[in-house]
């Protein structure tokens, strides 16, 4: 017959600590530190040690046999600004040079360069586009412009109605993985942050394009930068228009956008940034909402206004 036997080990429990001579720690004749190991570990933990990096970022540019150290690109994948190497999340950065080399026509074409980003487009030139990350849906990402959420609160179908043109963009940050803690519940699978260029000098740029099927487009940008005492000013205004009759039935579209950015910096102590944007487009949906009717049309209007204060 089997009998279950429980062996109970002797143990000591401390309800209080005493500094008397007969106390246990004093009898040992040694100094005992409680909890010092965890404190020391946290004080020496580096961001690089806990980072998840897809690829190692080399910030050195080799040209003509000489090495040039490039400036680090700060990303917004955390509460505090940090470089790509320090980010604890997978962050892909599409630089301005990448955009030039890709010869892209729209922002949606640029997003196709990022690993893990799925861009599904049912019209030309970025019309009616759905964007998703890592196999998620179009409602599970957040689109930001200079850190400001510009996602449509009603549906993710209109997330690509950007109020900026491709010429306004400095770089694009793609944050893969859950980011709801930082950017809200819609950032379930990630977030995309579009960072615009900051005016460094005075300049004017304009372009006009045209093609078959009544395609026409025009855009322009004006910027200026100057200093008054300890204040640094940077202003930029841009606008664009594009239309086409479409290569197939019910694929015509007409779209336009306008964007303005005002930046003020005071003696490297604080920055004030204000941005204002508007985007409008109308297009043929081409049986998107129902297969019963061939001719379907939709019109969307988006507006953006934000004011940000940053302390150094």
Which ranges hold each PLM region?
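N-terminal periplasmic "start-of-domain" segments of outer-membrane beta-barrel proteins
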Residues: 68-100, 130, 259
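Flexible loop and strand-edge segments within Gram-negative outer membrane beta-barrel domains
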Residues: 244-251, 255, 269-312
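Short acidic/polar hinge/loop motifs at secondary-structure boundaries
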Residues: 130, 148-176, 194-197
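Extracytoplasmic beta-strand/coil segments of soluble accessory domains associated
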Residues: 83, 108, 112-148, 170
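Short strand-turn segments of transmembrane beta-barrel domains in outer membranes
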Residues: 191, 196-226, 238-239, 244-251
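Membrane-embedded beta-strand positions of outer-membrane beta-barrel proteins
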Residues: 111, 192, 204-208, 235-239, ...
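Outer-membrane beta-barrel channels and translocator barrels
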Residues: 138, 199, 226-231, 265-269, ...
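Non-catalytic regulatory/gating segments with a bias toward low-complexity or hydrophobic composition
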Residues: 91, 99, 111, 172-173, ...
């Amino acid at each position: 017959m089997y009998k279950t036997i429980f062996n109970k080990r002797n143990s000591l429990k401390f309800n209080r600590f005493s500094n008397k001579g007969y106390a246990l720690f004093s009898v040992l004749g040694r100094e005992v530190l409680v909890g010092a190991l965890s404190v020391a570990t946290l004080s020496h933990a580096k961001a690089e040690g806990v980072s998840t990096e897809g690829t190692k970022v080399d910030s050195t540019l080799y040209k003509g046999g000489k090495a040039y150290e490039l400036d680090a690109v700060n990303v917004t994948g955390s509460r505090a600004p940090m470089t790509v190497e320090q980010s604890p999340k997978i962050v892909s950065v599409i630089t301005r040079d990448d955009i030039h080399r890709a010869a892209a026509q729209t922002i949606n074409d640029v997003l196709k360069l990022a690993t893990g980003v799925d861009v599904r487009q049912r019209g030309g030139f970025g019309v009616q586009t759905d964007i998703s990350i890592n196999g998620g849906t179009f409602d599970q990402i957040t689109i930001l412009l200079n850190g400001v959420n510009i996602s449509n609160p009603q549906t993710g179908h209109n997330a690509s109605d950007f109020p900026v043109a491709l010429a306004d963009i400095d770089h694009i940050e793609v944050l893969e993985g859950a980011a709801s803690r930082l950017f809200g519940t819609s950032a379930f699978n990630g977030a995309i942050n579009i960072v615009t260029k900051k005016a460094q000098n005075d300049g004017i740029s304009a372009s006009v394009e045209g093609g078959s099927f009544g395609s026409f487009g025009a855009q322009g940008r004006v910027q200026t930068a100057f200093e008054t005492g300890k204040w640094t000013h940077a202003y930029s205004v841009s606008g664009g228009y594009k239309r086409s009759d479409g290569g197939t039935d019910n694929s015509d579209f007409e779209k336009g956008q306008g964007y303005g950015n005002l930046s003020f910096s005071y003696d490297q102590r604080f920055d004030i940034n204000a941005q204002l944007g508007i985007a409008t487009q109308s297009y043929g949906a081409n049986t998107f909402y129902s297969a019963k009717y061939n001719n379907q049309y939709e019109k969307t209007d988006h507006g953006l206004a934000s004011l940000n204060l940053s302390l150094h």
